[in-house]
Curated annotation (Swiss-Prot):
Residues 104-113, 147-163, 292-302 have a biased composition (Polar residues). The lineage of its organism: Eukaryota, Metazoa, Chordata, Craniata, Vertebrata. Testis-specific. It holds the Pfam family Tex55. This is Testis-specific expressed protein 55. It is found in: Nucleus. The keyword Nucleus applies. Its main location: nucleus. PANTHER family: TESTIS-SPECIFIC EXPRESSED PROTEIN 55. Keywords: Nucleus. InterPro entries: Tex55 (IPR040760), TEX55_DD (IPR048377). The gene is Tex55. GO terms for cellular component: nucleus. It comes from Mus musculus. Residues 307-317 have a biased composition (Low complexity).
Length: 381
C-alpha cells in the first residue's frame, strides 16, 4: 500500500500547501478504492478494518493540516516582523507534527532527516536574508532623511536670503532674471561707493576751508597785535625850544613868594600845646623846569605864503594874545600854597592825634570852625 509523499515538506513550506492537500485527498481516495478492491476479491475482515482506520486517519490529518495552514497564514506578518518568535513557533509546530506522524504512521515508514535539515536551512537563510534587507533599507532611509532635510533647509535659507536682499523671486529659474538681479546689485553697490566718495570729498573740502579760515584769523591776530612804529614830526620835536624865557622867570619868582608866605604862616600860627613839628614843604620845581607852550600868530604867515601882500598886512594887524597851556598839577599846587591848605590839614591832624576824640569827624569840624574864627579876628584887627 503506497503512502503520499513526504508530509513534513508540506508543513514546513507554506507556499506548497494547496498541492499537499490535493495529494492527501488523492491518497485517501486511492486507499478507499484499494480497500474496496481487496474486499471484492474476498479479503478478510482485519484488512477491511485496517482500510477504514487509515481513511479516518487521513481525514483527520487533512483537517488538522488545513487548520494549521490557516494559523500559519495568519501568523505570517508577525513572523516576518519577529524572526525569533517565528523560528520558535515553526520549530514547535514541526516537532508536534513529527510526533503525530510517528504515532499515526506504521513503524516501517520513517522521514528522511536530510530533507528536514535542508528545508530548515532554507527557511533560516530566507529569514536572515529578509531581516538583512529590511535593516539595510531602514539604514539607507535614515541616511537619506538627514541629507534631504539639510539640502531642503539650505535651499530654503538661501531663498529667504535672496528674497530679503530683493534680487530673487519665485520665477528665479529664468537666467535673464538672474542677470538683471546681478546688474541691480552692481548698480546699488556702485551708487553707495559714489555716495561715500562724495561725502569724503565734501568733508575734505570743508576741512580745507576751515583750516584756511583758521590760518587767516591767526594771521590777522598776529598783525593786529604787532606794535606800529611811531613817527614824530619835526614841528612837535622842536616845540620845547620855543619856550619863552619870560615864563621861566615868572614861575621861579612865584615859587619863591610861596616859600616866604609859608614860613611866615608857620611862625605866626604856632601853638604852645602842640608838639614841635618841622613844616618844610618840598617842591620838585628846582630840578625840573616848568614848560609852557605858547602859540603866537607868527605861524600864520606859514599858511599864507602864496597869498597876496594885502592879506598878509591885514593878518599882521589883527594879532591874538598868546595862549599858555599849563600843567594841571602845577595849577593845583599853586592853589594849595596860595590858601595854605596843607598847613591847615597839618594842624588838624596833629590835634586829632594828640586829643584822640571819640568822634573824630565832629572834632575836625570844630577845629575848622575855630580856624575860621581866628582868621576873621585877624582880618578885623
Amino acid at each position: 500500500m503506497d503512502e503520499p509523499p513526504d508530509e513534513s515538506l508540506n508543513h514546513e513550506n507554506t507556499t506548497r500547501a494547496p498541492d499537499n492537500e490535493k495529494n492527501n485527498i488523492e491518497g485517501a481516495g486511492q486507499a478507499l478504492h484499494r480497500g474496496s478492491e481487496h474486499a471484492g476479491v474476498g479479503s478478510s475482515e482485519p484488512t477491511g478494518d485496517k482500510v477504514s482506520g487509515q481513511a479516518n486517519a487521513g481525514s483527520r490529518q487533512t483537517g488538522r493540516r488545513t487548520s494549521e495552514e490557516a494559523e500559519q497564514r495568519s501568523s505570517q506578518p508577525t513572523e516576518h516582523r519577529l524572526p525569533g518568535h517565528a523560528e520558535r513557533r515553526a520549530s514547535q509546530q514541526a516537532e508536534r507534527r513529527l510526533s503525530e506522524r510517528r504515532t499515526s504512521q506504521p513503524p516501517n515508514q520513517q522521514l528522511p532527516s536530510h530533507s528536514e535539515r535542508k528545508t530548515s536551512g532554507k527557511i533560516d537563510g530566507q529569514e536572515s536574508l529578509l531581516s538583512e534587507q529590511t535593516d539595510q533599507e531602514t539604514s539607507e532611509f535614515d541616511d537619506l532623511i538627514p541629507s534631504a532635510s539639510t539640502d531642503y533647509l539650505s535651499a530654503r535659507s538661501q531663498q529667504q536670503e535672496y528674497n530679503q536682499h530683493g534680487y530673487w523671486t519665485e520665477d528665479s529659474s529664468d537666467p535673464h532674471r538672474l542677470s538683471e538681479d546681478l546688474e541691480k546689485d552692481y548698480t546699488r553697490v556702485k551708487h553707495i561707493t559714489e555716495k561715500q566718495a562724495g561725502y569724503r570729498s565734501y568733508y575734505k573740502t570743508l576741512a580745507h576751508i576751515e583750516s584756511r579760515t583758521l590760518t587767516d584769523t591767526n594771521d590777522y591776530r598776529e598783525t593786529g597785535q604787532r606794535l606800529q612804529p611811531c613817527t614824530f614830526e619835526d614841528s612837535e620835536a622842536e616845540l620845547p625850544s620855543k619856550v619863552s624865557t619870560t615864563e621861566e622867570t615868572e614861575s621861579a619868582t612865584t615859587i619863591q613868594a610861596y616859600n616866604t608866605q609859608d614860613t611866615e604862616l608857620t611862625t605866626s600860627t604856632s601853638h604852645e600845646k602842640l608838639p614841635s613839628i618841622t613844616t618844610k614843604v618840598y617842591y620838585s620845581s628846582s630840578p625840573e623846569k616848568i614848560q609852557t607852550t605858547e602859540y603866537t600868530s607868527d605861524t600864520t604867515p606859514v599858511f599864507d605864503q602864496g597869498r597876496s601882500s594885502q592879506r598878509s598886512s591885514q593878518s599882521s594887524r589883527w594879532r591874538f594874545p598868546p595862549i599858555v597851556f599849563e600843567d594841571p598839577y602845577h595849577v593845583a599846587l599853586r592853589y594849595v600854597e596860595k590858601h595854605n591848605i596843607l598847613h591847615i590839614f597839618q594842624q588838624i591832624t596833629e590835634n586829632l592825634v594828640y586829643e584822640r576824640p571819640d568822634d573824630p569827624l565832629y572834632f575836625m569840624l570844630d577845629q575848622v570852625q575855630n580856624m575860621i574864627k581866628h582868621r576873621d579876628e585877624r582880618q578885623s584887627d
